[in-house]
Curated annotation (Swiss-Prot):
Name the UniProt record assigns to this protein: Sulfite reductase [NADPH] hemoprotein beta-component
This protein's pathway: Sulfur metabolism; hydrogen sulfide biosynthesis; hydrogen sulfide from sulfite (NADPH route): step 1/1
Pfam families: NIR_SIR, NIR_SIR_ferr
Family as reported in the entry's similarity comment: Belongs to the nitrite and sulfite reductase 4Fe-4S domain family.
EC number: 1.8.1.2
Protein purpose: Component of the sulfite reductase complex that catalyzes the 6-electron reduction of sulfite to sulfide. This is one of several activities required for the biosynthesis of L-cysteine from sulfate.
Reactions mediated catalytically: hydrogen sulfide + 3 NADP(+) + 3 H2O = sulfite + 3 NADPH + 4 H(+)
Length: 576
């Protein structure tokens, strides 16, 4: 294994650190910017602070050239992301989100890879009304983005209802414990009473500059790794024996993002360092976060994530630092096994209720011709007495359906032609894409709008090879930030330019291994021509129960990646 080249020494602070320091606990001049009717945008500094409030300024990239020719400013709009720990929401909240999507956004909702909602296409003048509408439904967007702990993920786990309920409660406790304490959110969006003297405020966990970069936490319940535990900055793996939650293994230092061409950036898988009882979870989470607060790189944001803090100083250093802050040591890690990181579709019977998992292609909730998905889910929400669970794979579980109500829900599913994905290929059922164009400002290539079209063509090859039902994890990301967690997929495409992608192979079916670059900067024709012989080879030579990601390593298409430090190929290894 190679060693990290990242320096432990901090240089001059990145400009974002100054913005946070002088923001008066995330207020900045956001309130004034919202009132400025001259432009549909806010200032650059406020845009960096707005993330902490759960929103990003964007523009419609499909319209950029046209508006530039007309000497108009970009078609500025905003994305709002909700904070929903564990992805659990009520039917009433679903209906509110549906209404806000039509009233203020682009008429659609996006289920994200971190189990929450995003609304796109909101203009500046409607931001506050949208936030207030969410708040009235007991939803918030605070800390859904920004250099802070983000939405805490939790295994949806309909098969083990009692365990899920207990683990879900811990995800909420961790989420609540790590919320910022500033009153800025309530002052700006909910028009609460302003604090006259900001010296009355403090952030005991974060401090006035919060974290160096985003921080992500998730809780998994084996054997399902649907939350991709190894991608999290901090992960808790539930240890369950005879239906009883004993505690959690603690995993640290995962993360997906990187920068094209910079080998000092890379995806990384987390490492399991020990075990704690449930009552210690929030304490462990807080101490881990404070270590990143104090030692994370605040000079170079490309190397500011927690994985680089650990890799530059060493896992042994981190464990010593954590033990010192805790005042006690984690117990030895307990045995666990994951079998997959996907979803189980269709009806599943729990202890007292039924749960229905629907396939939502790339998480987009909208009505299209012959598929009134948004309308169908709206009608279900009107009669559903349980809850909705947003899965980490961008799908939706209609959960806690009573036996008496099951037929009514099923009739609505059939009436609106909603799908469990059973007729789709195993590849499509395990597919995932980020939003990318036209709203994401970081996108280098299409993702959500293109992956379904590419899958249509790949499925032709699967049919030819007899692999249509083979479960294979495939993911696409429009840029190397990796919101769809592509580095853990058996097949992944990461955008480099419009129509061009890096192709990666060799992730594991259960999400425990990174993939490896196989071809660089290729378009659709080469993608299909590359996959065809590999699929044929797989169909012919796969061993019993062997998954595609394991096969391509055994067959020599790519080398196994055991750590993010070994992720980048040398030039002679790359096929171009």
């Amino acid at each position: 294994m190679t060693k990290s080249n990242i320096s432990k020494d901090n240089g001059p602070l990145d400009e974002v650190e100054g913005i946070k320091e002088r923001s008066n606990f995330l207020r900045g001049t956001i309130a004034e910017g919202l009132e400025d009717r001259i432009t549909g945008a806010i200032s650059d500094e406020d845009n960096k602070l707005l993330k902490f409030h759960g929103s990003y300024q964007q523009d419609d990239r499909d319209l950029r050239d046209e508006r530039r020719r007309k000497k108009l400013e970009p078609a500025y709009q905003f994305m709002i992301r909700v904070r929903t720990p564990g992805g659990v929401t009520t039917p009433e909240q679903w209906l509110v989100m549906d209404d806000l999507a039509h009233k203020y956004a682009n008429g659609s909702m996006r289920l994200t890879t971190r189990q929450t909602f995003q609304l796109h296409g909101i203009v500046k003048w409607d931001l506050k009304k949208t936030m207030q509408g969410m708040n009235q439904a007991l939803m918030t967007t605070i800390a859904a983005c920004g250099d802070i702990n983000r939405n805490v993920m939790c295994n949806v786990n309909p098969e083990q209802s009692d365990v899920h309920a207990e683990v879900y409660e811990w995800s909420k406790k961790v989420s609540d414990h790590l919320l910022p304490e500033t009153n800025a959110y309530h002052e700006i969006w909910l028009e609460d009473k302003k604090i006259v003297d900001s010296r009355e405020e403090s952030e005991p966990i974060y401090g006035s500059t919060y974290l160096p970069r985003k921080f992500k936490i998730g809780i998994a319940v084996p054997p399902s790794n649907d939350i991709d535990i190894y991608s999290q900055d901090l992960g808790f793996i539930a240890i369950v024996e005879e239906g009883k939650l004993l505690g959690f293994n603690v995993a640290v230092g995962g993360g997906m993002g990187m920068t094209h061409g910079d080998t000092n950036t890379y995806p990384q898988i987390s490492r399991v360092i020990g075990f704690c009882v449930p009552e210690k979870v929030t304490e462990v989470a807080e101490k881990v976060v404070t270590i990143q607060r104090d030692f994370g790189n605040r000079s170079n944001r490309k190397n500011a994530r927690f994985k680089y803090t650990i890799d530059s100083r060493g896992i042994d250093w981190f464990i010593d630092e954590l033990n010192e802050r805790l005042g006690w040591e984690l117990e030895g890690k307990r045995h666990y096994e994951f079998d997959s990181n996907g979803d189980s579709y269709g009806w599943i019977e729990g202890k007292d209720y039924w749960h229905l998992t629907l396939f939502i292609q790339n998480g987009r909730i909208k009505d299209v011709e012959d598929y009134p998905l948004m309308t169908g889910l709206r009608e279900i929400a009107k009669v559903h007495t349980g809850d909705f669970r947003l899965t980490p794979n961008q799908n939706l579980i209609i959960a806690n359906v009573s036996s008496d109500n099951k037929k009514q829900i099923n009739d609505l599913v059939e009436k609106f032609n909603l799908t469990e994905g059973k007729t789709y290929s195993g590849l499509r059922r395990n597919s995932m894409a980020c939003v990318a164009f036209p709203t994401c400002g970081l996108a280098m290539a299409e993702s959500e709008r293109y992956l379904p079209e590419l899958l249509d063509k790949i499925e032709v090859i699967l049919d030819e090879s007899g692999l249509r039902e083979e479960e294979i994890v495939i993911r696409m990301s429009g840029c190397p930030n990796g919101c769809s967690r592509p580095a853990l997929a058996e097949i992944a495409f990461i955008g480099k330019a419009p129509g061009k992608y890096n192709m990666y192979l060799g992730g594991s079916f259960n999400g425990s291994r990174l993939n490896k670059l196989y071809k660089e900067n290729i378009g659709e024709e080469e993608i299909l021509n590359t996959l065809r012989p590999i699929f044929i080879d797989f169909a012919k030579d796969k061993q019993k129960d062997e998954h595609f990601g394991d096969f391509v390593i055994r067959a020599g298409y790519v080398e196994e990646v055991k750590s993010g430090l070994d992720f980048h190929s040398s030039k002679e290894d790359v096929r171009s």
